[in-house]
């Protein structure tokens, strides 16, 4: 393959206009690891260069090759994403510590992913993290070639995404008065807790992830795990409240009232704004851990069951079929918006 490549201050990460941003990222990675400041260029070079390209012929669009000799480092992807993953592998080969030069051993790497969907999940509803921390999380995902970020944005313990049509979701639903200590010990820390992301925050984070070839899949959990939303809009619950943003862990009986037409409008409105913020093909609607206790004694829910002819059988109760009714409603709305539901 040849001898090692010496990266020093006159070595340029080089990419065409499409890959210029990746060249800049690589220069930043090298600076972070070693303190060595490199300039980037879009001009072709024959030596003393880390050349990025995306012309590799391969059946897998995320494939890449790395070749290192004494004059050049070549990173070639089957697409811009493939080149990006090659950059991440090169990044992991960098030494750490202040250096005037970096030696990259002569080598050849041919790599491609086994799985096209490589995902990670972050729950910011129960434990909020700042927008900067989310970006740091995305950086870590990029380092490990993760290309899907499942973002759990709402739950009983907090609503974290700004919905302009329902401002109380963040004014009230984003903050709980206190948090239980341990696993429902009955003791509380007495400290208010919360936070949320503005729609501008969301757009910036979505763009930041896309630059790293990561698709964010947002999750709005329904019809259970909605007590934070009910604290803001109690009329959406079976009892009308009052509710509070939940201070415990586990599963609460406070769920959306499916017999209330306002609930269906609420779901449509929220999903409209979510779809406008996230270009992902998939939108996650949760659907898990929804107790049917309130529905069994809610006149509106029982009326909906009767009106929709949702009958129990040997496998499902009428209330379980009521949940399916709501999920189908959400799915049909997302399909009309050109998206696919998961959950």
Task: Specify the residue positions occupied by each region the protein language model found.
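Contiguous, structured surface segment used for ligand recognition
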Residues: 3, 8-117
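Conserved, mostly hydrophobic/aromatic
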Residues: 30, 79, 120, 141, ...
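Active-site mouth loops of central-metabolism enzymes
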Residues: 119-133, 255-262
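A conserved hydrophobic secondary-structure block that centers on an alpha-helix together
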Residues: 123-156
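Active-site beta-loop-alpha junctions enriched in small/polar residues
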Residues: 125, 154-158, 221-225, 288-292
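An active-site-proximal structural segment forming one wall of the substrate-binding cleft
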Residues: 144-149, 202-223, 254-286
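Aromatic- and acidic-residue-enriched carbohydrate-binding clefts of CAZyme catalytic domains
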Residues: 157-211, 226-265, 294-318, 324
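Gly/Pro-rich turn-and-neighbor structural signature
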Residues: 264, 268, 272, 276-343
């Amino acid at each position: 393959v040849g001898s090692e490549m010496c990266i020093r201050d006159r070595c340029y990460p080089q990419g065409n206009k499409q890959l210029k941003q990746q060249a800049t990222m690589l220069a930043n990675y090298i600076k972070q690891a070693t303190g060595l400041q490199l300039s980037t260029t879009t001009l072709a070079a024959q030596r003393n260069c880390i050349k990025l390209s995306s012309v590799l012929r391969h059946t897998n669009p995320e494939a890449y090759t790395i070749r290192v000799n004494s004059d050049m480092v070549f990173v070639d992807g089957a697409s811009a994403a493939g080149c990006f993953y090659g950059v991440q592998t090169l990044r992991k080969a960098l030494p750490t510590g202040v250096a005037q030069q970096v030696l990259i051993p002569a080598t050849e790497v041919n790599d491609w992913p086994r799985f096209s969907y490589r995902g990670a999940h972050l729950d910011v509803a129960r434990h909020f993290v700042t927008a900067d921390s989310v970006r740091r999380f995305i950086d870590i995902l990029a380092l490990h070639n993760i290309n899907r970020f499942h973002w759990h944005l709402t739950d009983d313990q907090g609503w974290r995404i700004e919905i302009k049509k329902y401002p109380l979701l963040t004014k009230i639903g984003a903050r709980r008065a206190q948090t239980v200590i341990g696993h429902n010990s009955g003791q509380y820390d007495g400290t208010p807790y919360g936070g949320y992301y503005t729609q501008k925050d969301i757009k910036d984070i979505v763009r930041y992830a896309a630059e790293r070839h990561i698709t964010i899949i947002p999750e709005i959990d329904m019809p259970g795990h909605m007590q934070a939303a009910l604290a803001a809009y109690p009329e959406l619950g079976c009892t009308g409240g009052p509710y509070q943003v939940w201070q415990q862990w586990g599963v609460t009986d406070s769920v959306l009232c499916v017999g209330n037409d306002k609930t269906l409008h609420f779901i449509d409105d929220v999903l409209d704004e979510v779809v406008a913020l996230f270009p992902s093909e998939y939108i996650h609607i949760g659907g898990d851990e929804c107790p049917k206790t309130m529905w069994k004694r809610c006149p509106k829910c029982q009326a909906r069951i009767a009106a929709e002819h949702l009958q129990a059988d040997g496998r499902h109760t009428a209330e379980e079929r009521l949940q399916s009714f709501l999920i189908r409603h959400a799915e049909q709305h997302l399909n009309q918006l050109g998206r696919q539901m998961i959950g």
